[in-house]
Amino acid sequence: MKLSDAVKEKRPVTCLAYCAPGVGKSTFLGLIGEKSKGKTLVLDVDRTFIPTMSKNEVVHDFDRIEVMQIDNIETWDSWTATLKMLKELHDDGELQFENICVDNLSELERCILSDLGSKGKNKGVPAQADYQYMQFKLVNSLRYLKSLGVNVYITAWETTELFQNPDGSSYSRVYPKMSAKIVDNICGLCDVVGRIIVNKEGARGLLMEATQNAYAKNQRDTRKVCKVEEFLK
């Protein structure tokens, strides 16, 4: 394919939005579903999406949103079966979703580790190999979802790490909460990584420009920040 043709081609977007609990990750996915023309599937891991939507504060149109809960005890098998089902629907030409959302990756990681640990010999504590299984599983899962030809939206909680400069000064950086060994790989596979922030008036925005203090990027367009409800514009 010629590059001149490729840059004009409309391609699905892969976006990771992260924030502290309660700031607006589920609302972000709800707005994606409400404002999209096609159907949205939310793979619910942390069980906060439905309660958030039931408040009916920001999102009001749920007609094109479907929710599938991922088992948060037998998570490895449940997640594997879900990906297999989506692939089969895609291969049969029956995948009728414009967007597939994962809410949220941080909890999915912990659930997988807890599941693997419960089946091990360390009294529920994950073994070193379990961490490696989880890391490969999550990265490969994102590649898998991207291969379905749909928009992929992932949420995560945020965490903060303190960095020290050679001169002794230090600064903190906020980034999506997941295993440090895969954060660059996961974020690298996304077109957009945005931090959900709230201003003094209570309006939610999506920060999509990297700073010294926040992990972010936008390879979809030239915006550095936008209102959450305007992300699809």
Where in this protein do the model-derived segments appear?
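Conserved P-loop
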Residues: K2-V102, S106-E107, C111
